[in-house]
Amino acid sequence: MTRRLTALALVLKLSLTGCCWEAEPEPDDFWGDELPPEEQETSQREPAQISDFTLPYLSGQTFDPVTCIDGVQQTVGALLYEPLFTLDASFTPQPVLCERSSCDAQALTWTFALRSAVFSDGTALTANDVLAAYRRAAESARYGARFANVASMKAQDAHTLVITLTRSNGSFPALLDVPIVKAGTENVLVPLGTGPYVYTTAADGAALTANPQWQGSSLPLERIALAAVKDNDTALSRFASRSVHFLCLDPTGTGARTVGGAVESTDVPTAAMQYLGFNLSRTPLNDTAVRRAMSGVIDRGTLVSSLLSGHGTAAQLPIAPQDADYPKTYEYRTTAEEYAAALETAGVTAARPRSLTLLVNEENAFKRAVAESLCAQLTTAALTVTVRELPWGEYAAALEAGSFDLYLGEVRLTADWDAGALLDAGGALNYGGFASEQLSGLNDAFLLGGNASAERYVKGFAEETPFAPLLFKSKTVLTPSGLVDGMTPTASDPFYGFADWRFHLSGSES
């Protein structure tokens, strides 16, 4: 969805990559913490009046996709490097450097035949290049969790990679949107890639120029200018002054800041899920019917539309609604009467009232607002729910220690929608003590694949409600108004479908 805005909240978190298992990162207080103003649509689209499409980058910092700084380096890197697979708007893996893939009946051993591709120096892509990239990725904070269930990786021949898993996964290619660089060049500032552009320098500055070795379709621009910035704050200032023209950001991250001017905003659905966590050692949260009723009584649409300014999608299940197989039929609503009845059955009545607290990290104004709304929606004559705001470090420590009743959490799922870290006994993010061999088994069967397995899993999840998914966040791509038509960015690739983008540059059309 693209919107034309006169003002938009911009935030520090500029990363578009990284759909991996991890708890929400510690917030950055670089900017003040304030809610953005209401968005206003302009009455007419303004011409861009821009002669060169320009991207910001951090001069002197590596573009290596495994180790580079989150933000603008990753955005530029999306035009320099390619993965075996990229994810489309429905989170379905689409082959890029992979010619074909197959797996055994248990989805434990995967074989990937590589496309005949060439690095920008003219050398051929080999399975050893991919193997080297994956081995580094497996050791990294950014991508490591994707390879947690990998038993072995080997180059079967120059064009074939074999990966064996410790756990069946019929959707494993969805984890392989990891950019590939030429082995041995990862330690230079600009490692070699197979992407549509190459990094060049000239008297007029650094730029991306069309890669003559690239084997893809035609490009809308032969050259993309680069503007050096010292940090993310500078990138935002340069965007406000129209000296850079493309930013990827998190509009509901910690610390919002307003930038004026005619701006177009394209929302990009992500795999970042916000959810309500339960401590199952606390009454009445140890009652399955109460957890299920709580999940059903929450008005998720209001959370997204009113509190996140529409930058997200409501979801009651731990699968992004954009996924073509999202099981919407298993969503449900609980009436106030049904909620009160579930509480009464669990022993919570007006005569025997209870109080619960909901933890939220205090640095993020959007999350504080969501937490306040949840408390209002979950409070009844018999149950009082109040917010407890904590600094990030204390919030994380309280979760680890189990010192909470409820908490508002956020996690970036992988696009196979494996929720094992949240619901498996001993899972890294299972702070509430949920344990169900049956549901864990259903999750494993869901990963193996098949519509019947998916239906059994979401039905079992809805019945037990180990946690209550609330929404999946959207990121935002900003461009000056009137600069480009046909943008189709995805969470996996900010320049997805770039060949079909049309730029309106002053003095030319492309």
Q: What is each model feature region?
A:
Residues 56-105, 135, 192:
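N-terminal lobe/hinge region of extracytoplasmic solute-binding protein
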Residues 154, 200-207, 225-282, 410:
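Extracellular/periplasmic solute-recognition and catalytic clefts
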Residues 480-510:
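Long beta-strand-rich cores associated with HINT superfamily self-processing modules
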Residues 346-413:
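Ligand/substrate-recognition segments at binding pockets and active sites
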Residues 165-225, 231-234:
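Gly/Pro-rich hinge or "lid" segments in bacterial periplasmic/extracellular proteins
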Residues 386, 391-395, 420-483, 507-510:
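Extracytoplasmic/peripheral linker and loop segments enriched in polar/acidic and small residues
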Residues 296, 312-346, 364-367:
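Structural transition elements
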Residues 281-323, 458-466:
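Periplasmic-binding protein-like
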